[in-house]
């Protein structure tokens, strides 16, 4: 049921009070919940609790919801995804709503868990913000309203994935068919179903897999991590590339303890950052009717790759992984007949960080001869790095220096830009695109870890 005017006003009136509490509020919430319901430690990424990324993401989302609640209420009958014509009104909340729903699906969130979260959220509001019974009742109704939206959307996501060819719900056992070290800190894993001869669901290029690990050497709790799929969509296998972070637990475990033949538990592919290809005549790559050239899902604009529209892939560091899946996909779908301009613009710390250089070079030579590649290296080793071969420009990324790109934008070709990488890199790329007055519907980005708006 729609929320009453009294409920909406009460939540709007206290949104700033919650915001003023800052991270103290969300840290208190998580401490309370994870102490009283320790089973949820099997769901939450505890490293994101320690570095405060998850508390910050929750605070931003909660405040955005409270401030947008009136307009969200107007759309409650439609649920998610939000109609494109209303998206601009709700950027504060729906910019992250669909992304959150996919992340929840990847860790297997169930409706009963929303009740647990809601109880602890209300208790934290009472302890930290106000004990006013009318306001607490309003927040209770507002939370139930929000939980209903997410439960409904997540069930749609679960059902869609489960009903697809090769699809499943929750987790499924996969065997490590290949494991290869491609740089000092990156291993590639090829994963096939444990049940020989069974299909896997097609992923959309840019999506990720959640890997479920339970090992006492890591933690007494189950660990879940999401890794971007690097392979092109197929029904036989998935490939992921795992970068070992300095403070990592699960990536280190996968590097050091998981071998060929071992089994891993995986959730299906999820994620709202992807390139969705449209065949001529309005058909999606899976053959389903697709009359709309752009598919809007929450706050993410998932580009439908029309034949002439330029595509610009801009990875920073390990941000190559989801974009490599897009590049492989385009190479398979279009190949040497490709008529669109396609750019691969890689910004890396040094030449050793170019994990997929050989493959991108091979794609350019054999599959996409029109692919335009440009590399920026923050640090150049003049004793070993050759300009024009190992890199094109020294220093940080500058889109103005990419041959032909500024001209393409100025000519009104309306390229679509996909970028993934470290936070500073992503802010820099977005600022450069904004300086060119690139519209938001042509800017697509993914952020590893809890989502936060680029600033």
Please describe what each predicted stretch is.
Residues 312-334, 343:
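Phosphate-binding glycine-rich loops and their immediate beta-loop-alpha structural context
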Residues 206, 319, 422:
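Short, conserved phosphate/pyrophosphate- and ester-handling motifs at nucleotide-, phospho-/glycolipid
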Residues 341-455:
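Reductase modules of NAD(P)H-dependent flavoproteins
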Residues 164-270, 274, 279-283, 287-293, ...:
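Ferredoxin-reductase
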Residues 310-312, 418:
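Conserved beta-strand elements of the Class I
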Residues 1-171:
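Globin-like tetrapyrrole-binding proteins
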Residues 275-305, 396-411:
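Short amphipathic alpha-helix with an adjacent loop that forms part of the alpha/beta core around
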């Amino acid at each position: 049921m729609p929320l009453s005017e009294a409920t909406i006003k009460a939540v709007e009136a206290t949104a700033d009070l919650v915001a003023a509490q800052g991270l103290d509020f969300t840290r208190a919430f998580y401490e309370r919940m994870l102490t009283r319901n320790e089973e949820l430690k099997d769901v939450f990424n505890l490293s994101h609790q320690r570095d405060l990324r998850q508390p910050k993401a929750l605070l931003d989302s909660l405040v955005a919801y409270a401030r947008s609640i009136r307009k969200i209420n107007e759309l409650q009958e439609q649920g998610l995804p939000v109609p494109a014509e209303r998206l601009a009104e709700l950027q504060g909340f729906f910019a992250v709503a669909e992304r959150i729903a996919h992340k929840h699906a990847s860790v297997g969130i169930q409706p009963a868990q929303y009740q647990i979260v809601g109880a602890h959220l209300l208790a934290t509001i009472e302890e930290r913000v106000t004990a006013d019974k009318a306001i607490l009742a309003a927040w209770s109704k507002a939370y139930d309203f929000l939980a209903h939206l997410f439960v409904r959307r997540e069930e749609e996501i679960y059902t869609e994935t489960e009903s697809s060819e090769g699809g499943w719900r929750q987790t499924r056992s996969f065997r490590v068919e290949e494991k290869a070290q491609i740089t000092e800190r990156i291993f590639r894993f090829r994963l096939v179903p444990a049940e020989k001869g069974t299909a896997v669901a097609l992923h959309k290029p840019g999506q990720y897999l959640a890997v479920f690990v339970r090992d006492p050497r890591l933690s007494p709790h189950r660990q879940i991590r999401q890794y971007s799929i690097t392979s092109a969509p197929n029904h036989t296998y998935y490939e992921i590339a795992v970068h070992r972070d300095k403070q990592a637990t699960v990536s280190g475990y996968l590097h050091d303890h998981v071998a060929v033949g071992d089994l891993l538990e995986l959730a299906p592919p999820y994620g709202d950052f992807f390139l969705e290809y449209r065949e001529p005549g309005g058909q999606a790559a899976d053959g389903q009717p697709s009359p709309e050239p752009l598919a809007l899902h929450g706050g993410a604009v998932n580009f439908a790759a029309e034949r002439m529209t330029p595509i610009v892939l801009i990875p920073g560091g390990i941000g190559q992984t989801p974009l490599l899946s897009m590049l492989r996909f385009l190479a398979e779908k279009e190949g040497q007949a490709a008529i669109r301009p396609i750019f691969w613009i890689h910004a890396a710390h040094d030449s050793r960080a170019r994990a997929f250089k050989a493959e991108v070079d091979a794609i350019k030579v054999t599959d996409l001869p029109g692919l335009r590649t440009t590399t920026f290296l923050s640090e150049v080793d003049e004793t070993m790095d050759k300009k024009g071969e190992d890199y094109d420009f020294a220093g940080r990324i500058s889109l103005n220096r990419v041959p032909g790109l500024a001209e393409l934008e100025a000519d009104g070709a309306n390229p679509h830009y996909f970028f993934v990488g470290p936070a500073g890199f992503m802010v820099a790329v977005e600022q450069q695109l904004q300086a060119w007055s690139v519209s938001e519907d042509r800017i697509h980005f993914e952020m590893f870890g809890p989502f936060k708006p680029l600033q």
